[in-house]
Amino acid sequence: MTSLVYFSSVSENTHRFVQRLGLPATRIPIHDRDGSFRVDEPYVLILPTYGGGVTVTGRDTSYVPKPVIRFLNNPHNRSLIRAVIAAGNTNFGESFCYAGNIISQKCHVPFLYRFELMGTAEDVDRVREGLGEFWNHLETEKEHGQWRQPSLTRSRQEA
């Protein structure tokens, strides 16, 4: 069965997209300062991309939301990630859905899909279908002993 873990800010864009998928999903809490939120089954992560870069005042910001960083800094949670899907805004040019690139590289998992803001009906259909294919593919690999667990390496900066 497909398991999704997602983060959505107060804008609720990612939340609305996940709801439209109609699949079992667990939301990473917005306020989980101690990083105690935990999952216990393999999952695909869906997250929005934040601005990233440096603010006018010189404050460093992250493409990956802080609650997601805390969630993935837990070795148990990190060991269960199987892939990532990212939301973003095309107004940010090359940074569009960049959080997905970061998670994919740092956790050594595939970046399955990117969509804008709340996604379109086509995005919802493609993600739903793609997730089914992805989980079936993983099951086949596991049955044939070809599956490998993602990296458990922990980063200090970003997930």
From Swiss-Prot:
SUPFAM superfamilies in alphabetical order: Flavoproteins
Top-level lineage group: Bacteria
Gene Ontology MF annotations: FMN binding
Record Pfam families: Flavodoxin_NdrI
GO BP field: protein modification process
InterPro entries, sorted: Flavoprotein-like_sf, RNR_Ib_NrdI_bac, RNR_NrdI
Role played: Probably involved in ribonucleotide reductase function.
Family assignment from sequence similarity: Belongs to the NrdI family.
HAMAP family in the record: NrdI (MF_00128)
PANTHER family: PROTEIN NRDI
Name recorded for this polypeptide: Protein NrdI
Species per Swiss-Prot/TrEMBL record: Rhodococcus erythropolis (strain PR4 / NBRC 100887)
